[in-house]
């Protein structure tokens, strides 16, 4: 069963000039006559679908079925340009209409009603029955009930005239003008993803129409550029190309489904596959296009992310928007409250925390002042502060020199060097510099892409980078941020009484050293087996900062090996050096007593012991003006402690020397409840375990372990060993400087130098000497380590003897032994000496095994 839906087409009332436009030949007139006598348009739709819908109780609206139903008393008009046409997915007018224009159903119906029957020229009795929007095409199908005194042709003509008149009143009518066309066919209401095109495809279900007939039928909807009639290969398809989208859209919606001489016309938009210049370039020139694409992506990433990274680095240095104590406003508030609380404490006789460390640093006040003075000088500031581990380099710079200074960047080389993987290294470097955002995973992706492109095109894209280049880029970006901070208050022109003066950037930086940020690079060693490039990159970067005069740079190091690296970066620069050593015995004692003052007082009070009440700090200062404030807390501690307790503390401090970190650890242990002697014994035991794990365990190289044990024995007996005594030791003869410097870099010893020449060898810190003695006095441990050392010496001497014996073999075959008597005597003496060493070592091993 087929459902036949008809649409009355009163052809006899159509204007003849409109239908006959462009037809000039007899054949065209003959076919036109046939067109005039065409039957009403018919589109066959299966009735089974409608029956199924009715049985299921579903709607049969045009939106759901794609078919418009109307009676003979109704006329169907298509209004175009009601919505924005979807000619492209990225058409901006769609968003404009969606956001700024009222597209509700009532608003559209009111607009159609005003166009068809305006108040100033109404069609009396005209009723708008329904509207069916086709937003993709930008139009609306409107069904009107024809008034009794009008015919359909008259109503259609009046609606067209009113629409043309009303839509042309707007100032923007050229763009917003609407048109009304009677629907001759049976339109198919579909919302498929078929975007409008200027070309429509006509499929003939029956004999094809001629070009004249096609022109006559479709010309009224817009200017036609060309008509492509059916071909021999495809004799039932024709194409019509319009100049504008409006013509093609109106023709498709008004004519589709019309039947002429038993031929039904089905019209759709042509699916045009436009050739894109960019896609063609990438398809046809792969070897060039892919590198160009990655280059463009890199440029885009730089343009977008580099300003963000520079801002984040500035934030890391200035802490302008940070809520930490490094923020400028928090620093001012902290200074104000700190000074206020200090005054209150002093008034009530409380302790002043600002002086608890002063006596330890009295011997370094001059160096702190020198460092502050260097930072205020106009000359390039390149400072190297060297001191043993735990000597207080970090506190000297960060707490005593730069505590209240703005714009400080602190870099810890140790965190960078110890990064095991490339992503972890990049994350640590970015965290140190404030470099954000960073995408470590991109390196893995770009590496795979680089290999893929190289396999396809034979050349690399250059997109993948090594961690060295990435780190160098981070430093370059940081340099730009530091320069911006240094020149923040710079003005190219300064007004004076005599006029305007042009100020150069170099002159401004020379006159305002306080504006330059301070870069502190801690734990700079100069060499490393893993990530050793960090030292070179940092030294080159620091040299550039100093040469550009945009920052002060301070290096904190433990050894002199860093000087060689820095000299390579700045060969003509004279470094400002600060050498830090351990505190004196008196200052160490004063520091510990000042830290333990309150603890000792309240500890004795809690035990019920009689404690002599010390005078308040204020009374002490008033009664004894000759004493400094720094000695006040020490005198309090001496009053609280008896002579025996003071002697115990003095004896406990003897192994610690003046190393600040060890003194702080000792104070913490005592405050936790340990006796001074117990605290120092545990520290010595802990240091000995550390030495054993780092230098004397089975996992360590046997030669290195034997060298370490030999130095431990010597340093346990003597606080200082001259370097020339080590040169003659068996295990150091081959490369004495290399062995000593390796142990120094690993933190077992420290070596003093005179113009680069090794002079004296000491333990890395005073506590190590007590740890050396502890290891020597431990019979079981000393027996194992001593035996291992002696076996290494025996092996070393045995190897030397074998080498000499190999040399003696050819000499023994010479007939005249007198020719090489001198060499033979030399080798014989060497072998005898080594034999004596081996014999001695074996005797010691035998004694140790008893």
From Swiss-Prot:
It is found in: Mitochondrion inner membrane. Present with 5260 molecules/cell in log phase SD medium. Residues 1-44 form a transit peptide. The gene is YME2. Residues 607-621 have a biased composition (Basic and acidic residues). It is a single-pass membrane protein. Changing residue 502 to Y: In YME2-4; prevents mtDNA escape, growth on nonfermentable carbon sources and growth at 37 degrees Celsius on glucose. Keywords: Membrane, Mitochondrion, Mitochondrion inner membrane, mRNA processing, RNA-binding, Transit peptide, Transmembrane, Transmembrane helix. One of its GO terms (cellular component) is mitochondrial inner membrane. Residues 45-287 are mitochondrial matrix. Belongs to the YME2 family. Residues 198-272 form the RRM domain. SUPFAM superfamilies: RNA-binding domain, RBD (SSF54928). GO terms for biological process: mitochondrial genome maintenance; mRNA processing. This is Mitochondrial escape protein 2. The lineage of its organism: Eukaryota, Fungi, Dikarya, Ascomycota, Saccharomycotina. Residues 47-64 have a biased composition (Polar residues). The keyword RNA-binding applies. Plays a role in maintaining the mitochondrial genome and in controlling the mtDNA escape. Involved in the regulation of mtDNA nucleotide structure and number. May have a dispensable role in early maturation of pre-rRNA. It holds the Pfam family RNA12. It comes from the Eukaryota. The chain crosses the membrane at residues 288-308. Residues 309-850 are mitochondrial intermembrane. InterPro entries: Mt_escape_2_C, Nucleotide-bd_a/b_plait_sf, RBD_domain_sf, RRM_dom, Yme2_C, Yme2_RRM.
């Amino acid at each position: 069963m087929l459902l036949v839906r008809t649409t009355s087409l009163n052809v006899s009332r159509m204007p003849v000039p409109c239908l006959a436009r462009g037809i000039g030949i007899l054949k065209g007139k003959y076919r036109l006559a046939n067109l005039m006598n065409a039957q009403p348009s018919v589109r066959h739709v299966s009735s089974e679908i409608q029956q199924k819908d009715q049985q299921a109780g579903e709607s049969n609206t045009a939106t759901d079925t794609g078919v418009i139903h109307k009676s003979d008393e109704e006329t169907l008009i298509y209004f175009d340009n009601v919505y924005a046409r979807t000619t492209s997915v990225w058409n901006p007018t769609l968003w404009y209409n969606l956001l700024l224009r009222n597209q509700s159903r009532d608003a559209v119906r009111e607009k159609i009603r005003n166009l068809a029957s305006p108040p100033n020229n109404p069609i009396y009795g005209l009723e708008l029955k329904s509207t069916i929007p086709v937003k993709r095409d930008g139009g609306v199908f409107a069904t009107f009930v024809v008034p009794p005194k009008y015919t359909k042709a008259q109503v259609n003509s009046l609606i067209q005239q009113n629409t043309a008149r009303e839509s042309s009143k707007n100032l923007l009518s050229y763009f917003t003008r609407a048109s009304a066309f009677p629907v001759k066919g049976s339109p198919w209401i579909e919302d498929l993803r078929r975007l409008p095109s200027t070309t429509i495809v006509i499929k003939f279900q029956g004999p094809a129409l001629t070009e004249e007939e096609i022109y006559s039928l479709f010309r009224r909807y817009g200017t036609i550029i060309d008509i492509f009639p059916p071909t021999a290969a495809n004799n039932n398809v024709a194409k019509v190309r319009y100049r504008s989208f409006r013509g093609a859209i109106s023709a498709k919606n008004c004519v589709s489904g019309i039947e002429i001489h038993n031929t039904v016309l089905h019209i759709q938009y042509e699916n045009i596959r436009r050739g894109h210049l960019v896609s063609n370039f990438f398809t046809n020139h792969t070897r060039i296009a892919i590198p160009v694409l990655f280059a463009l992506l890199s440029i885009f990433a730089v343009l977008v992310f580099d300003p963000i990274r520079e801002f984040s680095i500035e934030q890391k240095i200035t802490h302008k928007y940070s809520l930490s104590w490094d923020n400028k406003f928090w620093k001012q508030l902290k200074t104000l409250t700190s000074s206020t609380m200090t005054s209150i404490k002093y008034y009530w006789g409380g302790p002043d925390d600002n002086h608890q460390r002063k006596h330890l640093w009295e011997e370094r006040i001059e160096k702190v002042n020198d460092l502050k003075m260097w930072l205020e000088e106009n000359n390039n500031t390149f400072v190297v502060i060297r001191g043993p581990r735990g000597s207080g380099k970090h506190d000297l710079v960060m707490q005593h020199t730069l505590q209240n200074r703005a714009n400080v960047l602190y870099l810890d080389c140790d965190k960078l060097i110890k990064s095991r993987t490339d992503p972890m290294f990049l994350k640590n470097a970015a965290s140190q510099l404030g470099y954000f955002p960073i995408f470590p995973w991109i390196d893995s992706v770009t590496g795979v892409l680089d290999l893929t492109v190289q396999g396809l095109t034979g050349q690399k894209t250059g997109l993948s980078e090594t961690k060295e280049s990435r780190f160098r880029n981070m430093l370059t970006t940081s340099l730009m941020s530091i320069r911006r901070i240094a020149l923040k208050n710079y003005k190219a022109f300064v007004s004076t009484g005599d006029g305007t003066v042009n100020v150069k950037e170099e002159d401004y930086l020379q006159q305002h050293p306080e504006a330059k940020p301070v870069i502190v690079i801690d734990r700079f060693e100069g060499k490393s087996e893993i990530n050793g490039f960090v030292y070179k990159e940092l030294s080159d970067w620091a040299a550039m900062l100093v040469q550009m005069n945009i920052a002060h740079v301070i290096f904190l190091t433990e050894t002199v090996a860093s000087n060689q690296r820095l000299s390579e970066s700045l060969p003509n620069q004279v470094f400002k050096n600060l050498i830090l050593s351990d505190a004196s015995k008196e200052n160490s004692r004063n520091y510990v007593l000042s830290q333990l003052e309150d603890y000792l007082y309240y500890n004795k009070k809690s035990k019920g012991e009689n404690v002599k009440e010390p005078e308040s700090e204020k009374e002490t200062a008033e009664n004894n003006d000759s004493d400094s404030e720094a000695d006040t807390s020490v005198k309090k501690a001496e009053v609280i402690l008896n002579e025996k307790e003071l002697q115990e503390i003095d004896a406990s401090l003897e192994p610690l020397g003046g190393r600040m970190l060890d003194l702080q650890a000792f104070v913490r242990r005592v405050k936790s409840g340990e006796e001074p002697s117990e605290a120092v014994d545990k520290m010595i035991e802990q240091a000995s375990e550390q030495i054993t794990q780092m230098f004397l365990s089975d996992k360590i190289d046997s030669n290195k372990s034997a060298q370490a044990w030999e130095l431990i024995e010597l340093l346990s007996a003597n606080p200082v060993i001259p370097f020339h005594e080590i040169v003659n030791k068996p295990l150091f003869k081959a490369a004495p400087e290399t062995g000593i410097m390796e142990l120094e870099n690993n933190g077992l010893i420290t070596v003093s130098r005179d113009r680069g020449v090794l002079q004296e060898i000491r333990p890395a810190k005073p506590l190590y000497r007590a740890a050396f003695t502890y290891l020597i006095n431990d019979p079981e441990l000393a027996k194992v380590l001593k035996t291992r050392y002696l076996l290494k010496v025996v092996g070393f001497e045995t190897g030397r003897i074998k080498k000499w014996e190999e040399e003696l073999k050819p000499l023994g075959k010479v007939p005249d032994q007198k020719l090489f008597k001198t060499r033979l005597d030399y080798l014989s003496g060497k072998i005898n000496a080594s034999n004596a060493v081996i014999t001695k070592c074996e005797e010691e091993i035998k004694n140790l095994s008893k």
